[in-house]
Amino acid sequence: MTKLTRRELALAFGAGALAGTAQASTRRPSVHPGVVGVAEARAELGKALGQETARLAMAGALAASVGAASGAEAAAVLFSPRDVVGIKVNCLAGKNLSPRVELVEALVNLVAETGVDRRNIVVFERSNRELQRAGFEIRESGPPYRCIGTNNDFDREPSTSGAIGSCFARMVSSTCSALVSFGVVKDHDLSGVSAGMKNWYGVIHNPNKYHDNGCDPYIADVARHPYIRNKLRLTVLDGVIAQCHGGPAYRQGGIFKLGMVAASTDPVAADLWAWREIESERAKRGMPNLEAAGRPVRYLASAAKAGLGIDDPERLSVVTV
């Protein structure tokens, strides 16, 4: 295991950054249940978004998600200058179906505008290798921001939440005071949908244990652990290129140009929106819905029951900019 001492972490993140980071920041975000902000962002498969397009899309989706006048104003609602902000990206599927670097960097810039030291903004995934495969550059220290794999740096002792018992990455248990899930709009061969919530499987040491019964209630149980629940500020979904069949790995025949970026302070609503878009594309192709295909999306009901967000389609409010 790759372990960093507290002194090494302090040097990496800046003096005083680690004081009290095991607890969530005193700033509690303004949660908007059921609200998902969506902005247009179009690009071809394998092609980058223009920097300005990425900036406008991220700022627009973020502002719409909290009813702010601008992306900067929205970020200031969600993050405090004292935060250590961890952005968990899902790079399992490689470059063709991972969060686009330019969108992630647009979010980093918005967070930095709130006064968060760029050394205290870290983009992370399970390993350096996964980040590099998705097009990210490993950066042990910032600015412009840190980008590293957790690389098996887990707590020594497991903790429980509902039906799960896992060692969590120290990045979420000890280092970060605020978290963002940055996922992709795609289907999953077991849970039906893999968007923002299942991304947190990447911070536990034993995710392979929690795939029975469509990953239910395990996705919800990971997300309701205090390390996640008390620190999660935002879910962002890259839907520039999405996938409706063949996930969670990249499958060329299953991709489609959704051309959207979504943001929400409600992780359940974010995944509900992704589910809706996936089902819409499957219907256009004459494919059975996910339940008929043997992949019912069960975990959202469990997450809503746990108080994590809204799973009722009638209460989903999509604000498009």
Predicted regions and their residues:
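Flexible, active-site-proximal loop/turn residues at the rims of small-molecule/cofactor binding pockets
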Residues: 15, 91, 185
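N-terminal secretory signal peptides and thylakoid transit peptides that target proteins
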Residues: 1-17
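Sequence-pattern detector for short linear motifs
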Residues: 9-10, 91, 201
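Boundary at the C-terminal end of the N-terminal hydrophobic targeting segment
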Residues: 22-24
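Extended, low-polarity segments enriched in aliphatic/aromatic residues
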Residues: 27-81, 94-105, 109-321
